[in-house]
Curated annotation (Swiss-Prot):
UniProt: NADPH binding residues: L190, I228, K230, S231, V232, R236, S239, N240
Intrachain S-S bonds: none
Keywords from the UniProt entry: NADP, Oxidoreductase
Keyword NADP: yes
Gene Ontology MF annotations: aldo-keto reductase (NADPH) activity
Protein's name in the database: Aldo-keto reductase Mkms_1985
Active site: Y50 (proton donor)
Superkingdom field: Bacteria
EC numbers on record: 1.1.1.-
Keyword RNA-binding: no
Region (Disordered): 257-276
Family matches, as Pfam families: Aldo_ket_red
Length: 276
């Protein structure tokens, strides 16, 4: 069974479960992406900053699948923001990936200190008009960044990919996304592994005969989130995709949601201005 599709505000759709390759070493990436595609994944999420676009693209090319069957996402790094720099960075990314278009291109971080994300998004819009990108979105944007972006460009991003897990469920931001028609995508959906041994999570998982990771992925799905768990282990990659044959109860959902404590595992987008 394939992943359900989430409709985007531009008329396109994205598979709800994909493989993320953040912190996947280049030497492991090709094998991980190949395992994911063999297991049925049709959505792969990389970024220029990950250093593994080339290996991601090679795995897709060698999979036997048509390019149109794989939803491919990459991200523009902070040092490449700005209109002209973005156009050049895009060409470099698709060259490394070995493709001629992207399904989704994201601004990796707002980098508020540089104040270039509006010009960057205007370049994204041009690339979309030119048929090089199907959907354009952002990552790690807070409400204030989204408002400036939309007010300045008149374009609502299709997706905002944010740190999101039971410890940091991002309720207010998800509510804003719903109001604006932005799809919510979760990075570090398993809390970087910190939740996999939590008795609340393992209890819910065991009641369904599932793993803790599967229960967490299902929690995201039932909230409506797009989710991109990361693994280099072929068995775990396959297991993380085996999440379409069960459903968490309202009590299960509430139990996992009760773990919220506001813990942020990654940088704060309001102050993260790193461009190295």
């Amino acid at each position: 069974m394939g992943a359900p599709l989430v409709a985007l505000n531009d008329g396109n759709s994205i598979p709800q479960v994909g493989l993320g390759v953040w912190q996947t070493p280049p030497e492991d990436t090709e094998r991980a992406v190949a395992a994911a595609l063999a297991a049925g994944y049709r959505h792969v999420d990389t970024a220029a900053a990950y250093g593994n676009e080339e290996q991601t693209g090679r795995a897709i090319a060698q999979s036997g699948l048509d390019r149109s069957q794989v939803y491919l996402v990459t991200k523009l790094w902070n040092s490449e923001q700005g209109y002209d720099a973005t156009l050049a960075a895009f060409e470099a990314s698709v060259d490394r990936l070995g493709v001629d278009y992207l399904d989704l291109y994201l601004i990796h971080w707002p980098v508020p200190e540089k104040n270039l994300f509006v010009d960057t998004f205007k370049a994204f819009a041009r690339l979309r008009e030119d048929g090089r990108i199907r959907s354009i979105g952002v990552s790690n944007f807070e409400p204030e960044h989204l408002r400036v972006l939309i007010d300045s460009t008149g374009i609502v991003p299709a997706v905002n990919q944010i740190e999101l897990h039971p410890l940091l469920p991002q309720r207010e931001l998800r509510e804003l996304h719903a109001q604006l028609g932005i799809a919510t995508e979760a990075w570090s959906p398993l809390g970087q592994g910190s939740l996999l041994a939590h008795p609340t999570v393992t209890g819910v998982a065991e009641s369904h005969g599932k793993t803790a990771a599967q229960a967490l992925i299902r929690w995201h799905m039932q909230l409506g989130n797009i989710v991109i768990p990361k693994s280099v282990n072929p068995q775990r990659i396959e297991s993380n995709f085996d999440v379409f044959d069960f459903e968490l109860s309202e009590q299960d959902m509430a139990s996992i949601s009760s773990l919220e404590d506001g813990s942020r595992l990654g940088p704060d987008p309001k102050t993260f201005n790193f461009t190295g």
